[in-house]
Amino acid sequence: MYKKTTLPNGLRIVTGQLPHTRSATVSIYVGAGSRYERDEEAGLSHFLEHMLFKGSSRYPTARIISEAIEGFGGMHNAATDREVTVYYAKVPDSAAFQTIDILADMVREPMMDAAELEKERSVILEELATVEDSPGELAGILIDETMWPSQPLGRNVGGPRRASLPFRSPP
């Protein structure tokens, strides 16, 4: 059974318990996705998804974030869609609260290091090329473009390959 709780600050939390498991999945859903992007911002939500794993105020590098979560025996990842971006980790149940702390710090206080931004740019461009080389994924993109032409819903969630290029880190 799942329970929805809204905190006084408006944060919505969904919890559920499966007593027969010894693991916990912690997910943070952010209301950021491709449908909210203007044409010149296409791909920004996906780009930010990647950047949040590059470091935060208390976990300043990608390696420190990975070592913290994997040190518990956990795994972490993220995904961007049209309406939300989700950051998640699956860890032993004993590490759930520490994992909440790590993911919350990533979302609330990301580092956005200029050098990391430039490195991630090439990773994202390669990822987009891989998607475009997959017949199944490409078919889905073309269907979306056909159904919703000239609209955010008709764009590739990751953005066009050229859209990832203009994003720059703040000075």
What does each model-found stretch correspond to?
Residues 1-21:
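N- or domain-start disorder-to-order transition segments that initiate the globular core
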Residues 6, 17, 64-171:
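Charge-rich, well-structured scaffold segments of protease-associated domains
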Residues 12, 31, 134-135:
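Hydrophobic alpha-helical segments, principally membrane-spanning helices and signal/leader peptides
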Residues 22-24, 96:
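A short local loop/turn or secondary-structure capping micro-motif enriched for an aromatic residue
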Residues 25-90:
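M16/MPP (pitrilysin/insulinase) zinc-metallopeptidase core fold and M16-derived inactive scaffolds
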